[in-house]
């Protein structure tokens, strides 16, 4: 008799989506608090004369975001009973951080300076990175929930940024 393992990795409600994206949201927010001095791009300037990413993406922030996002995933796994999230959360956290760096790359190529707004890109780049990683891990999302989760992440991101600005952790509220 063969042992069959049935795992439902379908994300079909907003609560599941928020729980799965918690490591991404924490990973994305942590570098703001962690700060850092050593830029991830090591000062590389591309042929367009602009930095690859800029001083806002630091090694310290990347490591802190990865650690905090991974830890948040373990806590979310314990709270939700989805122990697989504890295993997947480091990858989801890295996906979020990669998405955020991709957003910075795009902003630099468009000539948007560090700290200047790029509506939607600033709020959803990390979500798209984490979403891509979750799909690569085998999670399936209903289109409705993916859009609802994007809207929820957008609102949570805006609220977190305004709060960080009011607390003096960020220079701008976006």
Swiss-Prot record:
Enzyme Commission identifier(s): 2.7.7.67
PANTHER family: CDP-ARCHAEOL SYNTHASE
Family: Belongs to the CDP-archaeol synthase family.
InterPro entries in the cross-refs: CarS, CarS_archaea
Gene: carS
One MF term in the entry's GO annotations: CDP-2,3-bis-(O-geranylgeranyl)-sn-glycerol synthase activity
Keyword line: Cell membrane, Lipid biosynthesis, Lipid metabolism, Magnesium, Membrane, Phospholipid biosynthesis, Phospholipid metabolism, Transferase, Transmembrane, Transmembrane helix
Record field: catalytic activity: 2,3-bis-O-(geranylgeranyl)-sn-glycerol 1-phosphate + CTP + H(+) = CDP-2,3-bis-O-(geranylgeranyl)-sn-glycerol + diphosphate
Pathway(s) where this gene product acts: Membrane lipid metabolism; glycerophospholipid metabolism
Source taxon at top rank: Archaea
Keyword Cell membrane listed: yes
Membrane topology term: Multi-pass membrane protein
Biological processes annotated in GO: glycerophospholipid biosynthetic process
Record-annotated disulphide pairs: none
The protein's role, per its UniProt record: Catalyzes the formation of CDP-2,3-bis-(O-geranylgeranyl)-sn-glycerol (CDP-archaeol) from 2,3-bis-(O-geranylgeranyl)-sn-glycerol 1-phosphate (DGGGP) and CTP. This reaction is the third ether-bond-formation step in the biosynthesis of archaeal membrane lipids.
Name this protein carries in UniProt: CDP-archaeol synthase
Enzyme class: transferase
Transmembrane segments: 14-34, 59-79, 83-103, 118-138, 149-169
Subcellular location: Cell membrane
Cofactors (names): Mg(2+)
Record bears the keyword Transmembrane: yes
Cellular component terms (Gene Ontology): plasma membrane
Main location: membrane
UniProt xrefs under Pfam families: CarS-like
Species, as recorded: Aeropyrum pernix (strain ATCC 700893 / DSM 11879 / JCM 9820 / NBRC 100138 / K1)
């Amino acid at each position: 008799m063969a042992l069959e393992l049935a795992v439902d990795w379908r994300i079909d409600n907003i609560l599941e989506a928020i729980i799965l994206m918690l490591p991404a949201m924490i990973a994305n927010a942590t570098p703001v608090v962690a700060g850092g001095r050593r830029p991830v791009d090591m000062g590389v300037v591309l042929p367009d004369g602009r930095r690859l990413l800029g001083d806002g993406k630091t090694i310290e922030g990347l490591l802190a975001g990865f650690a905090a996002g991974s830890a948040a995933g373990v806590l979310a796994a314990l709270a939700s009973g989805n122990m697989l999230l504890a295993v997947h959360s480091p990858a989801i956290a890295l996906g979020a951080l990669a998405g955020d760096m991709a957003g910075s790359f795009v902003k630099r190529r468009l000539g948007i300076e560090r700290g200047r707004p790029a509506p939607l890109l600033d709020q959803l780049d990390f979500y798209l990175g984490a979403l891509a990683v979750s799909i690569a891990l085998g999670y399936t999302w209903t289109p409705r929930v993916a859009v609802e989760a994007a809207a929820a992440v957008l609102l949570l991101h805006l609220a977190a940024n305004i709060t960080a600005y009011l607390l003096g952790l960020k220079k701008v509220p976006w």
